[in-house]
From Swiss-Prot:
This is Sulfate adenylyltransferase subunit 1. The keyword Transmembrane does not apply. Keywords: ATP-binding, GTP-binding, Nucleotide-binding, Nucleotidyltransferase, Transferase. It comes from the Bacteria. Disulfide bonds: none annotated. The gene is cysN. SUPFAM superfamilies: EF-Tu/eEF-1alpha/eIF2-gamma C-terminal domain (SSF50465), P-loop containing nucleoside triphosphate hydrolases (SSF52540), Translation proteins (SSF50447). Residues 33-40 are annotated as: G1. GO terms for biological process: hydrogen sulfide biosynthetic process; sulfate assimilation. Residues 205-207 are annotated as: G5. GO terms for molecular function: ATP binding; GTP binding; GTPase activity; sulfate adenylyltransferase (ATP) activity. InterPro entries: CysN_GTP-bd, CysN_II, CysN_NoDQ_III, G_TR_CS, GTP-eEF1A_C, P-loop_NTPase, Small_GTP-bd, SO4_adenylTrfase_lsu. Residues 91-95 are annotated as: G2.
Amino acid sequence: MNSAVEAELAELGIEGYLSQHQHKSMLRFLTCGSVDDGKSTLIGRLLHDTKQIYEDQLAAVHSDSQRVGTTGEKPDLALLVDGLQAEREQGITIDVAYRYFSTQKRKFIIADTPGHEQYTRNMATGASTCDLAVILIDARKGVLDQTRRHSFISNLLGLKHFIVAVNKMDLVDYSQDRFEEIRDQYLEFAENLEGETNIQILPVSALEGINVAAPSKELAWFEGPSLLEVLENVDIDQKRSAGEFRFPVQYVNRPNLDFRGFAGTVASGRVSVGDEIKALPSGKTSKVARIVTFDGDLESAQAGLAVTLTLEDEIDISRGDLIVLENAQIESTNHVLADIVWMTEQPLQPGKAYDIKIAGKKTVGQVETVRHQYDINNLSTHAVDELPLNGIGLCEWSLNETVALDKYRESADTGGFIVIDRLTNVTVGAGLIRDRLDSVEQQVGNFSAFELEFNALVRKHFPHWDAKDLSQLLKS
């Protein structure tokens, strides 16, 4: 058992220990930055210095460090996070790795994201559920393209808190001049980020544990807090709980003739028994009769809670519909302006049909035009006809049906979507709705004769690929 946990259990008892941890606030954050900036090592150091590592884990790290470590005689703490064989052999992060730890003040969920450009989609996935970004910069290299890319994506995804950790200060002799040079370089770039962003910049050495969990004499010139102190005290606003009520229906629950409920997770806001609601896109209204959970009925439910709602009236609601309060100000449209993060080698092409998934709703859409692509180096824009792999651009989308939507910065769950290739069923992009546009009459989903014939051949000779029947998609 972890010695710190054992000591707490001895002092508080099991019930006291569980009660203490249950009432702590939760912070989700990600580590990002360029390749080899020390993201995994930093997380390993946080786990180690907060005594969150079990003795057998530490012994395994010491053993593995002799075989695949990159830190010489010292234990390679990055191995606590990089679990895939390919990651350990190459000394890089590929997949998003999640780790959990807690201190006396707070509980934490960390997403360790890859730094390589080809894994940008993994980084965007990790950032989409976080409240804060820890952006690492190698003190020897300064601000790089991936530093800017990850900062821009984090800002695009609505993160308002950035901690910029200038790592590997031990390799520049803890130079104050070098730290201030990098600080000024990053702040100049960050001036072009959208919205109000709280940025704190601090020097650290993840390998040596300098200024990670506690201040250090090596950085006596730095008067700011340690990384852990910032994480413990940063004030994260509870925007999801404070927003308007949104409930995307994931499943219509009808176990018998006497019960019909609508299951899903409250995306934002709060709902109570007796509240007047309306279902979108139909606009039909009713009242909440019950809020059902496995543990019994509730009087109210807030953001993040998975519940089943039953209504006083039998109105038509299906998977993908959105339940909101009757007086909610939300518009339905089939025409949106959205920022797109493109994640596949085949470029995003205007006019090509894609499956679009927004919360529980699945529809078909196509890009009418790519207005521009962002240049991550200076956040300027330039005109393009297509969006390439890892490109980020602003696009006009038309959908084949009217959908109730929010802007992404108002509600991530009902303002964000994923783009799915209709042939391979692979997620090829992520979209963040910037604005709703006037609805248009647009027919999407038409395929050429060659595409239909090729699809038929694939389904006949490669049935294990589970390719969709395009002729059926045209009828839907």
